[in-house]
Amino acid sequence: MKYEQLAKDIIQHVGGKENVISVVHCITRLRFKLKDEGKANTDVLKNMDGIVTVMKSGGQYQVVIGNHVPDVYKDVVEIGGFQNQAETETEDEKKYQGLFNKFIDIIASIFTPVLGVLAATGMIKGLNALFLSTGVLEEANGTYQLLHAIGDSLFYFFPIFLGYTAAKKFGATPFIGMAIGASLVYPTLVVLTEGEPLYTLFTGTIFESPVHITFLGIPVILMSYATSVIPIILAAYFASKVEARLRKIIPDVVKTFLVPFFTLLIVVPLTFIVIGPIATWAGQLLGQFTLWVYNLSPIIAGAFLGGFWQVFVIFGLHWGLIPIAINNLVVQGSDPVLAMVFAASFAQIGAVAAVWLKIKQQKVKTLSVPAFISGIFGVTEPAIYGVTLPLKRPFIISCIAAAVGGAIIGLFRSQGYIIGGLGIFGIPSFLHPADGMDAGFWGIVIAVVVAFVLGFILTYLFGLKSGNASDEQTETKAHTSTGTGEKEEISSPFNGSVITLSEIKDEAFSSGALGEGIAIEPSEGKLFSPVSGMVTALYPTHHALGITTDRGAELLIHIGLDTVQLDGKFFTAHTIQGAQVEKGDLLIEFDIKEIKAAGYAVTTPVIVTNHKQYGQLFLTDKQQVNAGDRLLELTR
């Protein structure tokens, strides 16, 4: 841990971890909620190396660190064991989220922990299918059987794995979730479905179901829950409510075993009798609906999903499609959804390859190599956030190329038959179980090649502005300083009134401890980039951001005072961390009226955090400025 000693000292002098209710951080400071602020040694903390100052505001004990606060926070949380408290704080902050965002968060939290292993077992299953279709192995071969068991294991017992992650997400005991999932795939109950039913319910309807056993005289509809998704998630949610209720009424002395005892006795039978059948029917209807939409126009569906897939990834919306894809595999035996988006990652790396070949900026060129390599294996985040999205045009072009690839996949009606690996390791996922390399498989191959080539050619021809492909010597000159009076101008990011830092009612800024600069009282809720450079920090609540200019100046712009408490309300970001921006680009919009109505000032410090690298810093003498006017001038 990089800041281990500092973290230990901070915990000690805020009164020890037992005095900490919770700790979160904003862009510059740790924000503690303490049981007793009187136990904190404020004077000691203020004089500590690595701490700028200490402040008390809004019921929080704030330890100002600086731009590296996320790293210090990580060590404080780990050493103090505050993870659960931090998670609780995050849940409180989610009160402003909409239902859709909550749904995406739930899906992501449940599936993310198992995706790595799911992809790995899928790769094994895909390679095994490839060996079978090419005649390398036969079904009766022991090697094939063992590889099949490894590859199919997680998917078959999916309810057990999801029982753990879903229970953890919903606040239940994870092992109770696993036990519920294990009950759903218990071999004896699975075998019973192969025998003669006692009778049949809902005869003649789409819900017709044979009954093989009863529970206390109540008919139990045994369904195939192997590989299923929806039943265990709903069961885990129900279990979390039951367990929470039981914990309130069962005495502590017997709580350890009686809570899971009664939870399982209540939840498992109800899952088999009610939750499981309803969830399974819902899954079947969802699968039929997805297939109906797809059949309306596979080409248009492929172009739409393929073209917007990387956009979905950026906003986390792709998590909403993954359960649908898995459900399709369970219900239909194949899935078109993940097939239609498969070419998107290859469109990305095609664009990245063109950027690497043409761009002269060494920083971006260096990023392109690892981004390309990771993209080959389906991990596109480095390509998106490090290369194509900051440059804008390559990202748009990659989406267009992915749309073409998706349309081709729709044309061939390609399907996925397993949840396989990513990138090149995902190709065997599209081998037909019976026909092997059928037309659908070759449709995937053609789409991948077309998406890559199209992304490469269009990016090479149209993807880079002339400034981004300029001579490398220009960039080198911009980053070097001989100490002979080289100047750099920082423009105003707002329209508004200029005030000095010393007038700000926040010691961390007014003292100059975080850096030298100036402050603005914005008259319009729009923040424009004051320089050309990179967004090196963007706090999740969008109230503050850091920008490093092309010439190396590090700026911190903090909209308002203590506005982190608004949890992102009234702020809208038009950029992301890692984005390359030009002077005058709109970065953030904010509602001045609503922020003030909530009781917060919008006075905004604009500071140079690495001001010590400069010999002089000149401030504007204007009292009113417009966005784009000269605000600061730095001289080395």
UniProtKB/Swiss-Prot annotation:
GO cellular component: plasma membrane
GO molecular-function terms, A-Z: kinase activity; protein-N(PI)-phosphohistidine-sugar phosphotransferase activity; protein-phosphocysteine-trehalose phosphotransferase system transporter activity
Record flagged with keyword Transferase: yes
Pfam families for the chain: PTS_EIIA_1, PTS_EIIB, PTS_EIIC
Membrane protein topology class: Multi-pass membrane protein
SUPFAM superfamilies (UniProt xref): Duplicated hybrid motif (SSF51261), Glucose permease domain IIB (SSF55604)
Organism superkingdom: Bacteria
Positions of transmembrane segments: 104-124, 146-166, 172-192, 215-235, 258-278, 299-319, 337-357, 369-389, 407-427, 444-464
Chain positions covered by the region annotation Disordered: 472-492
Domain spans labelled PTS EIIC type-1: 105-476
Keywords: Cell membrane, Kinase, Membrane, Phosphotransferase system, Sugar transport, Transferase, Transmembrane, Transmembrane helix, Transport
Active site residues per record: 26, 558
Main localization category: membrane
Entry-linked Gene3D superfamilies: Glucose Permease (Domain IIA), Glucose permease domain IIB
GO biological process, alphabetically ordered: phosphoenolpyruvate-dependent sugar phosphotransferase system; trehalose transport
Entry EC number(s): 2.7.1.-
Span of domain PTS EIIA type-1: 506-610
Top-level enzyme category: transferase
Chain's role: The phosphoenolpyruvate-dependent sugar phosphotransferase system (sugar PTS), a major carbohydrate active -transport system, catalyzes the phosphorylation of incoming sugar substrates concomitantly with their translocation across the cell membrane. This system is involved in beta-glucoside transport.
Domain notes: The EIIB domain is phosphorylated by phospho-EIIA on a cysteinyl or histidyl residue, depending on the transported sugar. Then, it transfers the phosphoryl group to the sugar substrate concomitantly with the sugar uptake processed by the EIIC domain. The EIIC domain forms the PTS system translocation channel and contains the specific substrate-binding site.
NCBIfam families: PTBA, PTS-II-ABC-beta
Name this polypeptide is given: PTS system beta-glucoside-specific EIIBCA component
Gene responsible for this protein: bglP
